[in-house]
């Protein structure tokens, strides 16, 4: 029998993932949304729009009857299950906003629940609330009116206090009316394990924002504290498992792993620093002193509200019930440790480019902790490696041309430390880059056509030299920068300073003077602005300088320029910085600058495909 579910918070960070997973069940979902048209567009862009399962009902959590039209209200009252995962994720909201969203919201949702239970019986109420809520199965049977100001819960922060009181209220109502309630307490939620894509940047993102600015010189709490994390796909799987219980009973489920399985704050910040390519803090400072410093003006400097430290904990939590439901190994197999660097790089990317949207023609995956964008298609994939002063998304137009002309899949890589990929600390820069090639090769057992532009071409040359490629693989090099016309030694600090402080006009002048582009009209729209924004990220700035240092090194120039090879090379003859690498193989000329794959993707694809068997 099809189960009807009222889902509140279905357009949020947790909710969208939940919809995706519930959609595989025999269900009909009433999705409470503020705007039906915006919600439909959101789910279409996410690829989660299941029109036969989803019914969008316009309303408002903060209004009586959830602000629903009478017809929608009657439909909603046919629900068998209510899942409440709604409310803002903003620790700085006012007391009035917090009361409206959480306490009033809890009241109006509970009224709907009571109406359903009296009429037909509510099978299950599922509420998602943060793991720091002080209420559980043992202490929530207390006769307190949560709407009276006298009960302050000894928590000064409006966000936390009202959220936790809402938790208590919904437990009270469930017991009073007689329906089972499952309260699910997740820790800080990050993106799914397949990608690490974390659109909710106000959680872990507060630490990322501070560290990327060099404003996290200490370790709050030291090794005794931790910031528990859970992936939203793991959380959604757990909610679905609870949803499918045959005879649900009222329980609290705390989704916090055992201490020995979790990262302490020192370890978390070390991984964060490494992923962002910055120096890690080592000196610990007590939480109370840290709060005092933040309350004394430190919050304005670091961007970290003092109350956000409440998400750090030195407590142990009972997760026995979770293990009973999911199995004893669940916390280990779903640990965010497995892909945390990708989460951090994703948050950093979102802070760097707050309005950047991913082209829906590409699906994003993680392969060996680097981000790879993939199209659909049949046959051997084209695998593209970008150069410096660019990332994988800059090669999307070329990738689309290759896909449309051949029908074959296209994979575009964000190199470590650039785009959405975390920096990877290795003994040498090339170790991480070659490891990326190795991971990709393991995914394409029948071979692939590798295409490297600029620095990406150097990666493929190095992999070829070390015999990574197989007979079924082929390679095209676009503008391999192996022979500089003029070599100038500039210290790394000067390079870093020059990039970080360069104006839009100076960057454009540099692009034309070096022949990245032949004329200003060939520079893609928003390219210069994107490059300038990129250097607000320490990860991208430091990685760019390090990779540039490596590509300019004497040893690598000798490796790339001396031996006679037989690569297919396409060369833009308006490049003013590099000479044609005639030793590397047959060269086809195009009348464009160094960045011709960005400025002329159609022409580039045409020349690449001249020698490709389709």
Residue map of PLM features:
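N-terminal Rossmann NAD(P)H-binding glycine-rich loop of SDR-like oxidoreductase domains
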Residues: 5-25
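NAD(P)H-binding glycine-rich loop region in Rossmannoid oxidoreductase-like domains
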Residues: 47-105
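Conserved Rossmann-fold NAD(P)-dependent oxidoreductase catalytic core, especially the SDR/UDP-sugar
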Residues: 81-84, 93, 104-158
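Active-site Tyr-X1-5-Lys
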Residues: 154-182
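Mid/C-terminal beta-alpha module of Rossmann-like enzyme folds, strongest
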Residues: 241-305, 347-356
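Amphipathic terminal alpha-helices
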Residues: 316-366, 611
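Active-site loop/oxyanion-hole signature of alpha/beta-hydrolase fold enzymes
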Residues: 417-451
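Flexible "cap/lid" loop of the alpha/beta hydrolase fold
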Residues: 465, 473-502
């Amino acid at each position: 029998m099809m189960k009807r579910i009222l889902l509140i918070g279905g357009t949020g960070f947790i909710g969208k993932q939940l919809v995706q997973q519930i959609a595989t069940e025999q269900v009909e979902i009433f999705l409470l949304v503020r705007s039906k048209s915006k919600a439909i567009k959101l789910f279409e862009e996410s690829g989660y729009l299941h029109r036969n399962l989803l019914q969008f009902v316009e309303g408002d959590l903060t209004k009586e009857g959830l602000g629903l039209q009478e017809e929608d209200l009657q439909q909603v009252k046919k629900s068998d299950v209510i899942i409440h995962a709604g409310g803002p994720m903003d620790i700085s909201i006012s007391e009035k906003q917090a009361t409206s969203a959480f306490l009033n919201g809890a009241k109006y949702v509970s009224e709907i629940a009571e109406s359903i239970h009296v009429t037909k019986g509510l099978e299950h109420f599922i509420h998602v609330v943060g793991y720091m809520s002080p209420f559980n199965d043992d202490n929530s049977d207390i006769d307190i009116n949560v709407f009276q100001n006298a009960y302050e819960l000894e928590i000064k922060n409006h966000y936390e206090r009202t959220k936790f009181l809402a938790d208590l209220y919904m437990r009270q109502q469930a017991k009073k009316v007689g329906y089972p309630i499952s309260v699910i307490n997740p820790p800080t939620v990050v993106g799914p394990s397949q990608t690490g894509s974390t659109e909710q940047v106000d959680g872990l993102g507060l630490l990322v924002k501070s560290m990327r600015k060099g404003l996290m010189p200490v370790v709050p709490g030291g090794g005794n504290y931790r910031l528990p994390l859970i992936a939203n796909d793991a959380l959604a799987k757990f909610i679905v498992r609870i949803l499918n219980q045959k005879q649900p009973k009222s329980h609290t489920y705390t989704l916090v792993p055992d201490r020995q399985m979790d990262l302490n704050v020192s370890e978390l910040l070390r991984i964060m620093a490494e992923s962002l390519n910055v120096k890690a803090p080592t000196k610990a400072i007590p939480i109370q002193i840290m709060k005092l410093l933040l309350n004394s003006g430190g919050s304005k400097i670091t961007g970290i509200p003092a109350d956000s430290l409440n998400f750090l904990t030195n407590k142990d939590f009972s997760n026995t019930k979770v293990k009973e439901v999911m199995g004893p190994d669940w916390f280990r197999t779903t640990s965010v440790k497995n892909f945390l660097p990708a989460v951090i790089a994703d948050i950093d990317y979102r802070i760097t480019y707050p309005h950047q949207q991913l082209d829906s023609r590409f699906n994003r995956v993680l392969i060996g902790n680097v981000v790879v964008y993939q199209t659909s298609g049949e046959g051997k994939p084209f695998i593209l490696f970008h150069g410096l002063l660019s990332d994988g998304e800059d090669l999307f137009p070329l990738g689309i041309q290759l896909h449309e002309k051949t029908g074959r899949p296209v994979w575009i890589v964000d190199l470590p430390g650039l785009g959405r990929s975390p920096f990877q600390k290795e003994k040498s820069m090339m170790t991480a880059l070659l490891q990326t090639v190795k991971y990709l090769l393991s995914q394409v057992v029948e071979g692939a056509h590798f295409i490297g532009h600029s620095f990406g071409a150097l990666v493929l040359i190095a992999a070829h030299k070390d015999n990574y490629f197989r007979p079924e693989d082929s390679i095209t090099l676009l503008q391999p920068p192996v022979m500089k016309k003029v070599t100038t030694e500039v210290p790394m600090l000067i390079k870093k300073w020059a990039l970080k402080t360069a104006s839009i006009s100076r960057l454009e002048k540099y692009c034309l003077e070096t022949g990245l582009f032949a004329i200003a009209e060939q520079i893609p729209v928003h390219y210069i602005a994107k490059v300038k924004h990129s250097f607000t990220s320490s990860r991208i700035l430091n990685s760019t300088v390090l990779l540039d240092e490596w590509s300019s090194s004497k040893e690598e120039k000798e490796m790339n320029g001396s031996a006679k090879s037989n690569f297919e090379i396409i060369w833009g003859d308006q490049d003013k910085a590099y000479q044609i690498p005639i030793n590397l193989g047959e060269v086809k000329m195009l009348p464009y600058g160094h960045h011709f794959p960005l400025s002329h993707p159609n022409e580039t694809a045409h020349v690449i495909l001249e020698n490709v068997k389709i």
